[in-house]
Amino acid sequence: MSTIAGESSSSSKMPENSQPTTTEKGSEYLEQLANEAEELRKKLDQERHKLNDIPIQQAAERLDVMGALGVKQRRILKGHVGKVLCMDWSLDKRHIVSSSQDGKVIVWDGFTTNKEHALTMPTTWVMACAFSPSSQMIACGGLDNKCSVVPLSFEDDIIQKKRQVATHTSYMSCCTFLRSDNLILTGSGDSTCAIWDVESGQLIQNFHGHTGDVFAIDVPKCDTGNTFISAGADKHSLVWDIRSGQCVQSFEGHEADINTVRFHPNGDAFATGSDDATCRLFDLRADRQVCVYEKESILFPVNGVDFSLSGRILFAGYGDYRVGVWDSLKCARHSVLYGHENRISCLRTSPDGTAVCSASWDCTIRIWA
């Protein structure tokens, strides 16, 4: 019995020169990859630093301080009975489309404040809306996971001509037309962006890269249409090549969800707004963040940003009901616009730069000029 027990005891011992398990090999490999990634990150930061020859505030020291703008509230558009979630200007510089938590999409005459069209969508929380370049149709969508396109006409019942052109696997958070009325770009809570053919409803290109919900997209005004930018809950802003479907640049810096993104008029930079109560300016050529627009007294999220026509002014809509006016080059706040009675959800400058429009949870859209 003792001999058998001794053999059993010796056989239960592991050999001293045992080989690493598959799990151990995998852990070592992952650690090696993490170290390589960290080294590459350091090299990338060094290359970015070489391009950052001078801080933007220092470069702007010789510029004169901006004088009084004289911007005031000129129009209030009332008609929604729920939180206004999104708005967009028509390229005719006169009409505005808005979408709301009440399930309504309204097309307004910004001069007269009259409602020209009102549509009831099959879902509440219509989170996105956009005018086509021709101003002859609008796109909208939200919690129904779909993007619908509606031709605008005074002769027919336009809701009968509504057609579905896109379907995501989660809510649609943003949309915009690309170059013409034929292509539409959407962003979704399913972490993807996609380009769709308006006529056929076919998916043309899918963009995978975000690790969280996509909240905002934008296309540069001066570009030929080969890039766009997206941002969202993963705190990253990604620049995409439309032709290849690949992410070509990634920017980080925010400490919370990014709610809004907007290209600078020259197309070489973009601004973001976040739940961390800051706006940030990123330079595509320098491949880095170049400015943070913040104040200790600002504690509320930024839900909408846009530039003036020259790019010198950055408008930002906050959760504290105010519109902040920033000098984008001196990185200093110039003034504040008061009027809304609830958080601002969206903000856009008119195509000719003569006005700014803000949408709010107070059920109104306001035009400032």
Swiss-Prot record:
One GO cellular component term noted in the UniProt record for this chain: cytoplasm
Biased composition (Polar residues): 1-24
Keywords: Repeat, Transducer, WD repeat
GO biological process terms, semicolon-separated: feeding behavior; G protein-coupled acetylcholine receptor signaling pathway; G protein-coupled dopamine receptor signaling pathway; negative regulation of gene expression; regulation of egg-laying behavior; regulation of G protein-coupled receptor signaling pathway; regulation of locomotion; regulation of nematode pharyngeal pumping
WD repeats: 79-109, 121-151, 167-197, 209-241, 253-283, 297-327, 339-369
Region of interest called Disordered, as start-end residue ranges on this chain: 1-28
PROSITE patterns, per database record: WD_REPEATS_1, WD_REPEATS_2, WD_REPEATS_REGION
Pfam family, one: WD40_Gbeta
Cystine bridges: none
GO molecular function terms listed in the Swiss-Prot or TrEMBL record: signaling receptor complex adaptor activity
Domain of life according to the entry: Eukaryota
Alphabetical list of PANTHER family matching this protein: GUANINE NUCLEOTIDE-BINDING PROTEIN BETA G PROTEIN BETA
Entry's family note: Belongs to the WD repeat G protein beta family.
Subunit structure as annotated in this protein's UniProt entry: G proteins are composed of 3 units, alpha, beta and gamma. Interacts with G protein gamma subunits gpc-1 and gpc-2 and with egl-10 and eat-16.
Described function: Guanine nucleotide-binding proteins (G proteins) are involved as a modulator or transducer in various transmembrane signaling systems. The beta and gamma chains are required for the GTPase activity, for replacement of GDP by GTP, and for G protein-effector interaction. Plays a role in regulating dopamine-mediated locomotion behavior.
Full protein name: Guanine nucleotide-binding protein subunit beta-2
Organism: Caenorhabditis elegans
Highest classification ranks of the organism: Eukaryota, Metazoa, Ecdysozoa, Nematoda, Chromadorea
